[in-house]
Design a protein with these regions (language model features):
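Conserved PLP-enzyme active-site core in the AAT-like
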Residues: 2-22, 26, 53-67, 72-218
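A glycine-/small-polar-enriched, mobile loop at the entrance of the PLP active site in fold-type I
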Residues: 13-51
Length: 218
């Protein structure tokens, strides 16, 4: 087995927590044991996903669940679902989205490099509000009405990054979006712990919530 030392990588002291750029979180032995057991047999992946979906739904209270290769993959797949729904013809066109609604509204202050995962599905991000958090100008935060006035016939949904101090409240954004028959996708990659968020965030009735399982889910 190759160690990081053999690859010439120096040891580090992680004072950041479970961040992606440092590998998420070390896996406990029981998780590694489960990996080893699972790798001993073949399984139809669609049946495995269906079984995992039922387990995730029972744990979170959500309608269903999907295991993806990280939160970024969840955002891409979730956005694709928002863009095309059950339309097989539109599915074939992705990531080309000309000819049907392809705009996802997002608060400017919630933009980051990770939202490329949303654009990768073919969505065009429409920013609302001012970037007061980054600029520290202290004028005001994004308000709910700014999301609503940005809705056009090209709007396919709303993206929301959940975190301490996220504004406006997710529940308010969801309620407004659903009045316009639009879905809401939530990037909650960094919202574990606490474990209660596994239920608390889906309880807002957001349509899609992406959690990072490689950080704090045990």
């Amino acid at each position: 087995m190759t160690s990081y030392k053999e690859l010439g990588l120096p040891p580090i002291i992680n004072a950041c927590g479970t961040v992606t750029r440092l590998g998420g979180a070390p896996m406990p032995s029981r998780v590694l044991d489960a990996f080893q057991e699972a790798a001993k047999e073949w399984v139809p992946l669609e049946q495995l996903q269906a079984a995992a979906s039922r387990r995730i739904a029972a744990t979170t209270g959500a309608e269903a669940g999907l295991v993806t290769a990280g939160s970024a993959a969840a955002l891409t797949l979730g956005t694709a679902a928002m863009l095309v729904g059950q339309n097989l013809g539109h599915m074939e066109k992705l990531p080309q989205t000309d000819g049907f609604p392809n705009e996802i509204i997002i608060a400017r202050e919630q933009r980051s490099g990770y939202d490329h995962a949303i654009r990768a599905a073919g969505a065009r991000l429409v920013e609302v509000g001012f970037n007061e958090v980054t600029s520290n100008a202290g004028v005001r935060r994004v308000e709910l009405w700014e999301f609503e006035v940005a809705i056009t016939p090209q709007t396919a949904g709303i993206a929301y990054v959940h975190g301490p101090g996220s504004c406006p409240k997710l529940s308010e954004v969801v309620e407004m979006a659903h009045r316009h028959e639009l879905p809401v996708i939530v990037d909650a990659a960094g919202e574990l712990p606490p474990r209660e968020n596994l239920k608390r965030i889906p309880d807002t009735e957001a349509d899609l919530v992406a959690f990072s399982g490689g950080k704090a889910i045990r």
